[in-house]
């Protein structure tokens, strides 16, 4: 399952799906081993993007902006040489709604300062104090977007994004009610796109994967930093990085 978070900027864009897929996490759910893996894909990975018979080299996150979810999925499939069965895409407003609907989540701010993005994006004023904190949707959005203060930069941000997803999954599973699940999905339906059927029968089938979601392993696809002739910063991923 490919999870994509679409960066809609300040939220002032007329199209709530206009933007780059700045969050891309590949989720593999294995009911036999009862384990799930989450692998973050760096948005700046330099890769081939093929559309309408033409191939260009560009950043991985631009595939969505060029051709929507279909092209983003195809590009990642080509890069990793895998088949992606399903996708779930959520925009920034949807993340806020989702966290609020499950009653907030508990995260651990590892820094000795408040996490915020107000300096770069004044419209987002939420802050997260150091240590273990119960946060709402607005705070979860800031927590999963901040990168300039993080010594690990975008890798640190992706680590926090995986933490937020893991905490949402844990909170949803703790509800243990089909009606609760349906209510959560309905609350974010305008700000979520997916090719997973979400009717009652399908939700019951998805509950068969519940045990596999109790153990989640987290990974990060890392390449080598590079600045190319165009002045842009990229991640160069080789077969060595992919095999690792």
Task: Report residues per predicted region.
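Non-catalytic, solvent-exposed segments at the cell envelope interface
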Residues: 1-244
């Amino acid at each position: 399952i490919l999870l994509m978070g679409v960066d809609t900027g300040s939220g002032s864009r007329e199209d709530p799906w206009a933007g780059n897929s700045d969050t891309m996490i590949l989720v593999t759910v294995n009911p036999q081993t009862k384990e799930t893996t989450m692998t973050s894909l760096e948005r700046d990975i330099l890769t081939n993007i093929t559309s309408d018979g033409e191939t260009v080299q560009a950043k991985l996150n631009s595939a969505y902006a060029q051709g929507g979810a279909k092209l983003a999925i195809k590009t990642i499939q080509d890069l990793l040489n895998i088949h992606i069965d399903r996708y779930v895409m959520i925009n920034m407003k949807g993340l806020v709604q989702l966290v609020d609907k499950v009653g907030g989540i508990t995260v651990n701010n590892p820094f000795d300062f408040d996490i915020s993005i107000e300096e770069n994006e004044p419209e987002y004023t939420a802050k997260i104090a150091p240590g273990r904190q119960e946060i709402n949707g607005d705070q979860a959005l800031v927590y999963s977007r901040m990168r300039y203060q993080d010594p690990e930069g975008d890798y640190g941000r992706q680590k926090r994004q995986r933490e937020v997803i893991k905490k949402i999954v844990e909170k949803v599973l703790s509800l243990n009610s089909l009606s609760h699940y349906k209510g959560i999905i309905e609350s974010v339906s305008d700000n979520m796109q997916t090719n997973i059927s979400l009717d009652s029968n399908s939700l019951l089938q998805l509950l068969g994967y519940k045990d596999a979601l109790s153990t989640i392993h987290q990974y990060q696809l890392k390449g080598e930093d590079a600045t190319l002739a165009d002045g842009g910063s990229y991640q160069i991923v080789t077969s060595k990085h992919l095999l690792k």
